[in-house]
Design a protein with these regions (language model features):
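Extracytoplasmic/luminal low-complexity segments enriched in Pro/Gly and acidic/polar residues
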Residues: 121-122, 131-171
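Charged, low-complexity, helix/coiled-coil-prone segments
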Residues: 2-17, 65-69, 142-154
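Short flexible coil/turn linkers enriched for glycine and charged/polar residues
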Residues: 40-42, 104-105, 146
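Juxtamembrane "stalk/linker" segments
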Residues: 1-49
């Protein structure tokens, strides 16, 4: 009877260990999906709207600068006109329009960023060197609001995540 009880205890311990491993793998998968944009996310953040006007048009470099500023300020997820921005996202000027994730976007450009709204808004609102002040001074139309509930959709583009063909894990 003691041997049987010991076996049952051993099996239960292995089962518990497997459940813990499964939970850990599930959490890591969930985190990875968030990082690569495969799931929609919601949280506090900011919404920045840039619009073309008669004097100045918004160009791809404006959007790239804004995305970089938001990333530096700790944005965890970003989208422009509902195009999820990933590490491999390109923002390209083509004639009179902008391509993001191979999709054409037009003004107004609504940039959503999830992260600490105080950090995000402070980084963009710095006097003299902040994105908003700098762009307004040169005549571009830029507005920002802090939001408690920003929703950013999952990436739904055709592009696959980058496949590593040459970079290998170091042994």
């Amino acid at each position: 009877l003691t041997d049987t009880q010991n076996k049952i205890a051993e099996y239960q311990q292995k089962l518990d260990s497997n459940e813990q491993a499964s939970e850990l793998i599930e959490k890591e998968l969930e985190q990875t999906n968030l990082l690569v944009g495969k799931t929609a996310v919601t949280g506090e953040g900011v919404i920045v709207t840039l619009e073309d006007n008669n004097e100045k048009s918004i160009v791809g470099s404006d959007l790239r600068t804004l995305v970089n500023e938001l990333k530096l300020a700790g944005a965890e997820a970003i989208s422009i006109n509902n195009e999820r921005i990933l590490n491999m996202t390109e923002i390209v000027d083509v004639n009179d329009f902008i391509l993001i994730n191979e999709n054409r976007i037009v003004s107004p450009y609504v940039v959503k960023a999830i992260g600490n709204q105080t950090y995000l808004s402070s980084a963009l609102s710095l006097k003299v060197s902040g994105f908003i002040d700098s762009y307004q001074k040169i005549g571009k139309t830029v507005k920002m609001t802090k939001e408690r509930n920003v929703k950013i959709d999952a990436y739904n583009g055709r592009k696959k995540l980058m496949q590593l063909n040459y970079a290998k894990e170091e042994e």
